[in-house]
Amino acid sequence: MGGRNVGRAAALRARSVAFPSVAGFCIATAALIVGLALAAGMARAQDLIVAHGISTFGDLKYPADFPHLDYVNPNAPKGGEISEWAPGGFDSMNPYSVKGRAAALASAPFENILTGVADEIGSAYCLLCSTLEYPADRSFVIFNLRPEARFSDGSPLTAADVVFSYKMFLTKGLTDFRTVLAQQVQGAEALDAHRVKFTFKPGVPTRDLPQDVGALPILSQAHYEANKLDLEEPGMVPFLGSGPYVLENAEAGSSVTYRRNPDYWGADLPIAKGKSNFDRIRIEYFGDSAVAFEGFKGGAYTFRNENSSRVWATQYDFPALAAGHVVKAELPSGTKANGQGFLFNLRREKFQDPRVREAIALMFNFEWSNETLFYGLYSRINSVWENSWLAAMGVPSAAEVALLQPLVDQGLLQAGILTDEPVMGPASGATQLDRRNLRRASALLDAAGWMPGGDGVRRNAAGEPLTVAFLNDDPSFERVINPYVENLKSLGVDARMESIDQAQMEARTRPPSYDFDMIVGNARSSYVSGSDLMQYYGSETADVSAFNVMGLKSPAVDRMIALVMAAKSNDDLTVATQALDRVLRAERFWVPQWFKATHTVAYFDMYEHPETLPPYALGELEFWWFNADKAAALKAAGALR
């Protein structure tokens, strides 16, 4: 696709990590620390902090008696339908298994004990619980569940369901997640019908753990057992959750529709006011983005997050837009970049040498691509935490050096990391093939023992050619990959693109297969990182992780992850994350791509949103609403069926 951003499509089709929050973050999207103030609605009882929520460092933004979130319209009307698209197909309603292809938004019916908000980083507020209790050292946490909480069939949600859900994810969750969970959580117990306690293992960093377990999706034990469901297996019978939406209809490979539960137990909670406003959320499936765009123009679905710069710049000239029936808008986004890039499969021997990876990266010409293919709409990604204060910049600070020096002394890092600026994408010229970068890449491959032969193809001492295959399941992305392939061929690399469908892509990039050379994916991160980093970049989970698809195994990265997890203040966390960013970038496990700092959206003119959007979410499915009068006008004009 002409400058696609894979994050949106991937988010719709990806299965959820075992402990997703409502805001869509993975486990440990926020962390915790001591010293939370009484002014934030907390009180001490028997040496426990009792609170309506928890914050990483400092006070919570919202007090215990807040009426609603600042960024919602508490009087937003309920009704109508919003529809979007997803690529490929699906054959399962289980978002927590690597088997099968889960439907888009399959985790939407489930709620967490705690939930994040879109205008505050590092916080979580009670949702299924009314309060939580924890000691200053966070060695355990007790959640006081709301007695009124109900599953969507009306049955009560109890502490027994929480313990059951924990045990299911511990024994049947994604392998990388349960590996991390088993290292950190000693156990869960129901103290009574509405009190559940999680105890953490001694000696592990506990800063994140109350919020980690608070992000547990809660499943109905009775429904699970009565239907003989299995968290590890795909299936079209969904688990029973307590959320505001339930599955209405699923046509495998075609569409999936969720309807708002009119009897949703939590509708009047302050945390829920002004949210979940649509009666229905429908996802239509298409083979690729080009076909999906034609469907949008014809009204097959009504809201489109445009991830193609080419389409955005050249193809929004259809009749519905000209007639004012469709709104085309760029809305502000304060979020960091999603880490999109070409990912190496580091399990392949040919990619073990960082000089090879650096040489291949030199052949991607971002500047030419942005001007020629992307209409100048993108900025380059350099950092795993691009477009945030967590990105490493300039030479390391003294505080960063203090963290990095021991790793250099132990031979885990090159000494240059202490004095050099972080690894940046190579600057390239205006022509597709930058000759200066070609010479640099040639020297690197020569030094790595990959020498050009009489046919121009580089081979190692054993006579094996240097081959690079790009797996691609999006036809519109071919025009991005093909020039890269041509540049690599000029370097003597036997490069090619291998086109496959979405089902094949998922099968070949999941554990234990990992059958690829390079793919387009994401270097994941969160604003307040913790044990999620072990899933994304940790050595221990590299061969079982659904997220560390590149197979990164680095003792230096592991040590830095431990320092991030152990940070005791906001300043310490920032410094440790910036230092980790330097180390990750030095590993050269990816060829970073691009991002834009706005939401480019188009939608039929029957949706409305708060005047000021929150910085960390577009929220069209969460807190936008439906204007029935505008919808009727569109139908009267023949713009919608």
Where are these regions (language model features)?
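Gly/Pro-rich hinge or "lid" segments in bacterial periplasmic/extracellular proteins
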Residues: 61, 89, 107-122, 213-282, ...
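N-terminal lobe/hinge region of extracytoplasmic solute-binding protein
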Residues: 45-137, 144, 167, 174, ...
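Aromatic-rich, solvent-exposed beta-strand/loop patch
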Residues: 126-130, 152, 157, 199-219, ...
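Ligand-site clamp/hinge motif
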Residues: 146, 233, 266-317, 358, ...
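Aromatic- and charge-enriched surface segment that lines or borders ligand/interaction sites
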Residues: 71-77, 98-105, 131-175, 189-191, ...
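Surface-exposed binding/hinge segments that line
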Residues: 144, 179-227, 242-251, 394-410
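Extracellular/periplasmic solute-recognition and catalytic clefts
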Residues: 187-189, 248-259, 284-348, 355-359, ...
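Detector for C-terminal structural segments
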Residues: 24, 47, 86, 90, ...
